[in-house]
Swiss-Prot record:
Record-listed ATP binding positions: G170, D171, R172, Q173, T174, G175, K176, T177
First-level EC class: translocase
GO cellular component, one term: proton-transporting ATP synthase complex
UniProt keyword Translocase present: yes
Gene: atpA
Reactions this protein catalyses: ATP + H2O + 4 H(+)(in) = ADP + phosphate + 5 H(+)(out)
Highest classification ranks of the organism: Bacteria, Pseudomonadati, Pseudomonadota, Gammaproteobacteria, Moraxellales
Summary of subunit composition and partner proteins: F-type ATPases have 2 components, CF(1) - the catalytic core - and CF(0) - the membrane proton channel. CF(1) has five subunits: alpha(3), beta(3), gamma(1), delta(1), epsilon(1). CF(0) has three main subunits: a(1), b(2) and c(9-12). The alpha and beta chains form an alternating ring which encloses part of the gamma chain. CF(1) is attached to CF(0) by a central stalk formed by the gamma and epsilon chains, while a peripheral stalk is formed by the delta and b chains.
EC number: 7.1.2.2
InterPro entries assigned: ATP_synth_asu-like_sf, ATP_synth_asu_C, ATP_synth_asu_C_sf, ATP_synth_F1_a_nt-bd_dom, ATP_synth_F1_asu, ATPase_a/bsu_AS, ATPase_F1/V1/A1_a/bsu_N, ATPase_F1/V1/A1_a/bsu_N_sf
Name the UniProt record assigns to this protein: ATP synthase subunit alpha
UniProt organism field: Psychrobacter arcticus (strain DSM 17307 / VKM B-2377 / 273-4)
Amino acid sequence: MQQLNPAEISNLIKQRIQDLDAGATAKNEGTIVKVSDGIVQIHGLEDAMYGEMIEFEGEVYGMALNLERDSVGAVVLGDFLKLQEGQKAYCTGRILEVPVGPELLGRVVDALGNPIDGKGPINAKMTDKVEKIAPGVIDRQSVDQPVMTGYKSVDTMIPIGRGQRELIIGDRQTGKTAMAIDAIIAQKASGIKCVYVAIGQKRSTIANVVRKLEQTGALEYTTVVVASASEPAALQYIAPYSGCTMGEYFRDRGEDALIVFDDLSKQAVAYRQISLLLRRPPGREAYPGDVFYLHSRLLERASRVNAAYVEKFTNGEVVGKTGSLTALPIIETQAGDVSAFVPTNVISITDGQIFLESSLFNSGIRPAVNAGISVSRVGGAAQTKIIKKLSGGIRTALAQYRELAAFAQFASDLDDATREQLDHGERVTELMKQKQYQPMSISEQAAVIYASNEGFLADVPVEKIGSFEEAYLRYMHDEQADLMKEIDDTANYNDDIAGRLKLSLETFKQNHSY
């Protein structure tokens, strides 16, 4: 029988102890003391940062929003029903990040950037912080390039430039989403990448939007970020910031991007819900005191940045190119009340607003743009030459027509000049109507506006304006394709182009029916 050597055994044990790497890691952990309505109170997380990701058991994450003396209030980004009092919570030392890059184009993702379209994983090479500081004054460049929405009424009267924030505001069912989707569809030839953020909407509505983008081929250059009505308030609050980060990826690399927030009223409601559950003091309309900052820090990130900023950001890889992120936030009003708390906030943050009116919508004027109180504060500098030259009198004609039409109801006999003005206004109103999902190119808009300005519509019955426009544009594409291409390519306006447009109108009216 083999004899055991105690010295050998003790040496082996000593060797094992010396070789043992316990791998002690310092972890900042706390204990959940309360869970309710998607809000978690955690005791013991002393080093938590504001906005830091908190990890719970079962791979559930949260975000620290309230840093109190002896506890941390966090919102749960996911299913809070999995959490229980007494479970551990850990600091991650990371601020919330989402995947960014061209890999997200053509995909539908949730507020955290996870794919929800059943097309497999997104192999994004980069992630970026959801909350970022907007570019400073020195890094910016003035807005002087257009974003064509394809709407005659918008591109002529309320032009939008690259890097602008233009609010779309109106009651429910006035065509706000339709206008934003058309603006995305109109970017097919412009090279502008798009992000559509759906906040607090029904899933069926979002599915219809995605289907329409797919049918028109617009999904190829668009990312859809979804935080539907059935998702926690925390995700509805974060979704716009996530979408903005995805859009900024293109802006910072010298490209142009367009982001639609549909709509920020629901984000404000979600943030109000979170704030009240975190026991923050309510203010006007029960919104928290920082609801203005909620939207201002988001919309300030939409900007046009100069070539020096892009060159510095890309470490000299992209030289001599400016980048832009254009925002179209949507706000829903109640009974046309634009002086409510959130609408006035967003109006004061943005560079103009397109006001859609339910009375115009119901009377068949679609898009239902109220030309009187819709403005674009910086877009005028970005308008293309031909549209700027031709569209000068349209806003005036419409505003005067509305005023005179109201006055004419009470007057029995009108002088010829007034009657002429009313007739012209009626035709311009009819001309500004446009079908959904049919954005118009620069040449198409220029052709029909020229016809209106030069009096070619004066003898066309009002009810036939639409069919005249369709037939004339068909004729222009068939017979004057070179002229249309020249206008689209150069966007210039000179005597030669004016003469050719005039000749084409005279020929069309003589030889074609409508």
